[in-house]
Design a protein with these regions (language model features):
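N-terminal, active-site-proximal structural segment of metallo-dependent hydrolase catalytic domains
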Residues: 1-113, 346-353
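Soluble or luminal CAZymes and related metallo-dependent hydrolases
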Residues: 37-40, 70, 111, 145-148, ...
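Active-site environment of divalent metal-dependent phosphoester hydrolases
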Residues: 35-37, 64-67, 94-97, 137, ...
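Active-site beta-strand/loop signature of hydrolases that rely on acidic residues for catalysis
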Residues: 26-32, 45-71, 91, 119, ...
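Beta-strand-turn-beta hairpins that frame and shape the catalytic cleft
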Residues: 14-27, 112, 116, 120-126, ...
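Surface-exposed cleft-lining segments at the edges of enzyme active sites
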Residues: 62-63, 133-143, 168-176, 233-234
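Metal-dependent phosphoester-hydrolase catalytic domains
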Residues: 1-13, 129, 190-197, 204-353
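Short aromatic-enriched loop/helix-cap "lid" or pocket-rim segments at secondary-structure transitions
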Residues: 40-42, 70-72, 98-102, 131, ...
Length: 353
């Protein structure tokens, strides 16, 4: 039964028919952190000048029937309220309410699904899941789950641009090589040629996070490299060394990521004084580590920026990449632990239909 549920794609149509042809199409990717702050996220999609002008939304970490997110169907509820078509691919059937502060959510899970989605103003065709495997046994630890990470891909009939899109969340609890292998599985599941965009949370932290021990060893390696040097040359530029295989793989398949992203710009941050982050990490990182983390980040106000959300584009011209910090930074509570990212896509001569 669980396997059948996890293999079932959910789709719905709420968009008006016949949206117009445009000189460029706006794509937004945002990790919604389960949809815990759904009401604020919906308001942002409705009213923020950039978000409300999107044509395609690649949303990751969306719940269905989880207590932590009000037992909503996050992707469907967003699509209905925003007048969009949607496709949702479940990744996990959760056997608990979550980890860290999520375990304290009131009520119980009514369904317990979690996954990734595509929302679109234009018709979604041939939506399909792309299983990409786990980097760690999800039955270990407090948040016990059945299933595996799954990307969701679809063909979108944009006027003037026949585009394949893929909403991606690479496994946070994984090695660098496993993230590269997950991206290869995604690329193997997409057409070998033609216009395409891959977007989402790639978790390019530079760390081997498959275990607490590996993460702690990696932390000390980065301390020896120097915190400032590590932040500038690795955390904000993961493609330079630790995650280079993933980015080179994309280039070998004809995908352009350099022009599709605002380089050197953070999309999330670790704040050593954030109580929620501290509680979540405390479940698998020993308490003594936090004093050393504070020491390493003492010159950076206890904050460590990371660039882990990305686009890669093939067969279309990327333009004007953005990172929107205001939903996360300086907002209590933040709408998500990730920034939204965006890009405009212009058809090139080969992509006309």
């Amino acid at each position: 039964m669980a396997e059948r549920v996890l293999a079932t794609l959910e789709t719905g149509r709420f968009a008006p028919h016949g949206p117009p042809r445009k000189p460029s199409y706006r794509v937004v990717a945002w990790n919604l952190e389960r949809g815990i702050e759904y009401e604020g996220q919906l308001e942002a999609f409705r009213t923020h000048p950039y978000l409300r002008s999107g044509d395609l939304y690649l949303v990751t970490e969306t719940d269905v029937g989880m207590a932590r997110s009000g037992n909503r169907n996050i992707a469907r509820d967003l699509a209905r309220n925003l007048g969009l078509d949607y496709a949702f691919a479940p990744c996990y059937l959760n056997l608990s309410k979550g980890a860290g502060v999520e375990s304290e959510a009131s009520g119980e899970n009514e369904i317990g699904l979690h996954g990734n989605a595509i929302l679109s103003r234009y018709p979604i065709r041939n939506a399909r899941p792309i299983p990409i495997g786990n980097g760690r046994d999800k039955m270990r630890g407090r948040e016990k789950r059945l299933g595996q990470q799954v990307a969701v891909a679809a063909d979108i009939g944009l006027p003037g641009l026949d585009l394949t899109v893929c909403s991606v969340h690479l496994d946070a609890q994984s090695k660098q090589n496993h993230r590269r292998d997950q991206m290869q599985a995604i690329l193997d599941g997409l057409p070998a040629a033609g216009p395409a965009v891959i977007g989402g949370d790639w978790n390019t932290t530079t760390f081997d996070s498959s275990s607490a021990t590996a993460a702690i060893i990696g932390y000390w390696v980065r301390v020896m490299l120097g915190p400032g040097n590590t932040i500038r040359k690795h955390f904000l530029r993961p493609y330079t060394y630790f995650e280079r295989k993933l980015f080179r793989l994309l280039e070998s398949r004809g995908f352009n990521w350099r022009d599709a992203n605002l380089l050197d710009e953070r999309t999330t941050s670790y704040d050593v004084e954030d109580a929620k982050t501290h509680k979540n990490l405390r479940e698998w990182v020993p308490a003594w580590c936090f004093d050393f983390i504070r020491w390493a980040l003492r010159e950076f106000d206890g904050k460590c920026p990371l660039k882990i959300d990305w686009f890669a584009v093939r067969g279309a011209t990327p333009a004007a990449p953005v990172v929107i910090h205001e939903f996360r930074e300086g907002r209590k509570p933040p709408l998500s632990d990730h920034d939204a990212i965006g890009i405009d896509l212009r058809p090139d001569g080969r992509s006309q239909i």
